[in-house]
């Protein structure tokens, strides 16, 4: 009915426009966990219009712009992935990492995507591109996209206040999303949580990735290993960040299995904590399992936060100050 989306190459020759799906976040880093949603972006090769396919009924053909066509396609993909069935649904989908977030179009042409990142993107969007990976679609478009993102992330000059930018972003996340208090702990965005480890890794990638291509990893643990190999992260820090990150990731898995939903908050209820601790392997014979677990959690997050503060902290400032 809508035909094929077409665009022109540099010589003016018309051809079918390519399409791809970009995985961001945990999907891009191949770090999906139980109940992880999919952070995705839809891109297409370039602007143009659809043309009828061979043997198409001209009475039924409805020409569309490429953007209109690919918006329909993206909506169809989201609908299939999120369709609720008696067995549940496949994934929750999050497309807010696209240019301009929810205010922007659902799909972007590669030239428009590039222009956005060259002129309008916020510093955190450059950081988010570290994990961008084409997960489906045209191989040729994937090469173009990943070449461009490597240039944006690693080849462009860095702001003089890079550490402060990342540090302030972390502050906002902890305050607005973590929202910790005496009764609530957030293992992802809270103090010493997984985001602390990820931001340390990403800060050092941005700082050194231009001259050291081996650091251009999407996976956090691979990045930590690469930083160690390049002599940019002390062995003791690397071991503590790696073991701490694995502990928190395993905790996230168990927490989501116990609750059968996407959660990152620890309850203050002793019975629920004891149940979670037993799932993690803390034995009753060694004492109260919830206390043993909370002691290790406190020690792990404190260690992670100390390393984060040392590497990223602005002079005379502290993320832990009220």
Question: What are these language model-derived features?
Answer:
Residues 1-322:
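A nucleotide- and high-energy phosphate-metabolite-utilizing enzyme signature
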């Amino acid at each position: 009915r809508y035909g094929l989306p077409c665009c022109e190459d540099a010589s003016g020759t018309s051809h079918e426009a390519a399409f791809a799906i970009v995985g961001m976040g945990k999907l891009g880093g191949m770090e999906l966990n139980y109940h992880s949603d999919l952070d995705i972006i839809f891109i297409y090769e370039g602007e143009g219009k659809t043309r009828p396919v061979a043997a198409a009924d001209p009475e039924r053909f409805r020409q569309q712009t490429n953007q209109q066509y690919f918006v329909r396609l993206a909506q169809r993909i989201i609908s299939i992935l999120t369709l609720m069935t008696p067995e549940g649904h496949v994934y929750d989908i999050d497309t807010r990492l696209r240019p301009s977030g929810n205010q922007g179009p659902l799909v972007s042409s590669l030239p428009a995507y590039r222009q956005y990142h060259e002129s309008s993107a916020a510093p955190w969007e450059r950081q988010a591109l570290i994990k961008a990976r084409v997960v489906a679609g045209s191989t040729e478009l994937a090469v173009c996209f990943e070449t461009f993102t490597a240039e944006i992330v690693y080849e462009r000059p860095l702001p003089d206040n890079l550490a402060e930018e990342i540090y302030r972003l972390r502050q906002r996340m902890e305050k607005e999303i973590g929202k910790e208090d005496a009764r609530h702990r957030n293992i992802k965005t809270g103090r010493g949580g997984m985001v602390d480890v990820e931001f340390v890794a990403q800060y050092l990638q941005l700082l050194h990735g231009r001259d050291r291509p081996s650091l251009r990893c999407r996976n956090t643990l691979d990045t930590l290993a690469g930083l160690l190999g390049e002599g940019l992260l002390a062995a003791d820090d690397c071991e503590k960040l790696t073991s701490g990150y694995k502990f928190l990731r395993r905790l996230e898995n168990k927490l989501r299995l116990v609750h059968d939903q996407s959660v990152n908050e620890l309850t203050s209820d002793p019975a629920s904590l004891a149940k979670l601790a037993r799932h993690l392997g803390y034995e009753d014979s060694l004492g109260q399992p919830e206390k043993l677990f909370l002691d290790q959690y406190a020690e792990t997050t404190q260690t992670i936060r100390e390393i984060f503060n040392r590497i990223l902290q602005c002079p005379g400032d502290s993320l832990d100050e009220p």
